Amino acid sequence: MKPLATLPTDEARGLRGLLFDLDDTLLTHGLLVRVAYDALWDLHDAGLKLVAVTGRPSGWGEVLARQWPVEGCVTKNGAVHVLRQGTGVARRDACDEATRRSRRVRLAQLVERVRELVPEARLTDDVDARRSDVTWDIGERMKLPVDRVRIVVQAIGEAEARSTQSSVHLHATYDTDDKASGALRFLSQQLGEEAGAAVTRFAFVGDSGNDAPCFAAFRTTFGVANVRDAVSRLSVPPRYVADRAMGEGFADIAAEILRKR
């Protein structure tokens, strides 16, 4: 990972937009600090298209798409798009309703199995708003020991589901999307960007293991300082890293992009 200050001017000037994670990237321990929100508006006012890419549920995306200076949100780690449409929002699910219902039944069975194996594992407080996955709190409101997390991950695999892990949540899903495939589909279907060009025209900012697909897919990638805690889980680390963590690091990344443009 290179220092943020080494971002080349021509690379910054070639960007049309910025994709960004929420928890522990834009948000600081769940809070949207002022410098991070100001940075979003600075990027927007400079003409960059902004898209949030998060493991959070689509209900979060509906609020963000209405109130923030973004084109929309890629939620559920890629499965559901939420986009601004006039004065309202529209939701685009990658699955049809029958498939979604079937997968929800299997996820409910998985939740019961995990409850038997690791009774202290708690579902996240936003799980009722989720359509495509279930999530356990491993670091947001409680810290689940690593050995217990491993047991949950093993149970997810035995149920033929897929697990992903952020800095705060452990996700289980039967969907095949990840953040990169969901983001590229959003850029293509909602913004009209050709996927091959989008990976160089859009940058990504993240901090954790479930950001790995985007760190690998996009040319220009940034990590806030706390990404160093997740480097061992990343096959491809971000290209540039900020000196500060979370929202303050995001603000520094935004400022560097704008300074070089």
Task: List each model region and its residues.
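Mg2+-dependent phosphoryl-transfer enzymes with acidic/Ser/Thr/Gly-rich catalytic loops
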Residues: 8, 13, 33, 180-261
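Residue-level marker for buried hydrophobic side chains located in beta-strands
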Residues: 18-20, 73, 204
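Conserved acidic, metal-coordinating active-site core of Asp-based
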Residues: 110-217
